[in-house]
Regions:
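Short aromatic-rich membrane-water interface segments that cap or initiate transmembrane helices
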Residues: 1-2, 63-81, 192-208, 271-276, ...
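Transmembrane helix-loop-helix hairpins at membrane boundaries of multipass inner-membrane proteins
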Residues: 2-109
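Specific lipid-exposed transmembrane alpha-helices and their immediate membrane-water interface residues
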Residues: 6, 10, 50-54, 59-61, ...
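Alpha-helical multi-pass transmembrane bundles of energy-transducing inner-membrane proteins
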Residues: 22, 26-29, 103-113, 117-200, ...
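Membrane-interface alpha-helices at helix entry/exit sites of multi-pass transporters
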Residues: 30-35, 155-159, 235-245, 327, ...
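Membrane-interface helix termini and inter-helical loops of multi-pass transporters
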Residues: 54-72, 183-198, 258-271, 327-328, ...
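Short helix-boundary/re-entrant hairpin motifs in multi-pass inner-membrane proteins
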Residues: 64, 209-277, 304
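Interfacial segments of multi-pass membrane proteins
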Residues: 144, 232, 315-324, 394-411
Length: 416
């Protein structure tokens, strides 16, 4: 048994505390310590992924208390991909933050705390432990959004806090219902207990509904997306890039884990209505997110609404629950994280160089800042799914999966 899973959660937490304490002695310690912690995170993530892509998942039992009574961390190929994505993206955005800000020790400490929360959500095999990391992620994200200058950032963070608290509370209630019916929190054990209890039992159905509703808020699926446009638009550019790339991405990954590792495909087969609601929610999110995106004048707000649409696609893939669609969902999750983070970073660079932040102000950008215009164009085309970009590949597999599942409405909105 390797200690790497635990170290990948503990290292950024330790780094966060170290940054705060070192800052009491010397002001400019936050940057080098955060870079060091991030490099350790990347190295550990790559090493763990190399093991996880072997024959069996990597498992770590916290405190020596074996599952189902103790907390188990499990890293398979899917969660290893998420861990590497989190580590690499966070290091990349950190480099931009050094130039564009914020640069305070509190910012760096909170940044590392968010990395810890996202990593923990990705590798835990305990639903209550997932809730704990969900809360850590939320609190760190709220603080980072509020780190911008001016009252708009604080107001956006407050809105994010209020809506996010509702989502976390729904998720916790869902855990409570599951625990009442089964007496366990370990995902593997819980899956078996739920099957024994019966997938059509009202308690099991209520637990599923609450867990999914809570994660819908965190993912920002329409119409519970209201926190996202303000948060992305008013946060510092580096924070917008960081949270847009990873926060909803990891929440969508958590949804996939809850649906397939805890409730399983058999639950969806036994509850056709629940599956239909998931598909309908995905279709609505794709359509309304796209419509709202094209009506925006501010670039960052447009990109935020684009995320509402893009994650509707991922939710739809999870809902149809076949291998083709899920392959597309995972490709799209990784691709979206890189593309959307890159788009927000490009918006920040363009604003720094030219002051342009609206669609109208981007007119003639190719003459004023050709590098920024080129980068934005390439990333935007990839995002909308122009072949052969990764955005096209993910959408194509999701559409094929929707056709296989006879989900015609989903297939149409994905392809259109």
């Amino acid at each position: 048994m390797t200690d790497l899973p635990a170290l990948l959660v503990a290292a950024p937490i330790f780094g966060s505390v170290t940054v705060l304490l070192a800052g009491l002695l010397r002001e400019r310690t936050g940057w080098p310590l955060t870079v060091l912690a991030s490099l350790v995170q990347v190295g550990g993530a790559v090493a763990l992924a190399a093991q996880a892509f072997g024959d069996e998942p990597v498992r770590y039992v916290v405190g020596g208390f074996t599952a189902p009574f103790g907390i188990e961390l499990v890293v398979d190929g899917l969660s290893a991909t998420m861990v590497v994505l989190i580590a690499v993206v966070s290091l990349g955005v950190l480099g931009y933050a050094r130039a564009a800000g914020p640069r305070s020790n509190v910012f760096y400490a909170t940044y590392l705390l968010l990395v810890a929360g996202l990593t923990g959500m990705s590798i835990t095999s305990d639903v209550f432990n997932m809730y704990v990391f969900l809360e850590i992620t939320g609190l760190a994200a709220y603080a980072l959004v509020a780190s911008g200058e001016g009252g708009e950032s604080a107001l956006a963070a407050l809105k994010y806090l209020l809506v996010g608290t509702v989502g976390a509370s729904l998720f916790l209630l869902g855990i409570g219902y599951a625990y009442i019916g089964t007496g366990t929190l370990n995902m593997t054990d819980l899956s078996g207990q739920l099957a024994t209890l019966g997938y059509t039992t009202p308690l099991v159905q209520a637990s599923f509904g609450l867990l999914v509703a809570g994660l819908f808020v965190k993912i920002a699926v329409f119409p519970v997306h209201t926190w996202q446009p303000d948060a992305y638009a008013n946060a510092p550019d580096s924070v917008s890039a960081f949270i847009s790339a990873l926060v909803s991405t990891v929440a969508a990954y958590a949804l996939a884990r809850i649906v397939f590792s805890v409730f399983t495909v058999e639950f969806l087969l036994a509850n056709a209505f629940a599956q239909s609601v998931l598909v309908a929610g995905a279709v609505v999110s794709i359509v309304f997110g796209s419509v709202l995106a094209v009506t925006q004048t501010e670039l960052k707000r447009m990109l935020a609404y684009s995320s509402v649409s893009q994650f509707g696609l991922v939710v739809g893939a999870i809902a149809v629950a076949n291998g083709t669609a899920l392959t597309g969902a995972m490709i799209h999750l990784v691709g979206h994280a890189i593309m959307k983070g890159g788009l927000f970073l490009t918006c920040g660079l363009v604003a720094t160089e030219t002051g342009a932040r609206t669609v109208e102000e981007y007119d003639g950008l190719v003459e004023r800042f050709p590098l920024g215009a080129g980068a934005f164009a390439v990333l935007a085309f990839a995002m909308v799914g122009v072949p052969p970009a990764v955005g096209f590949v993910g959408k194509w597999y999701v559409a094929l999966g929707a056709v296989e599942a006879a989900a015609a409405a989903l297939a149409v909105v994905v392809l259109v």
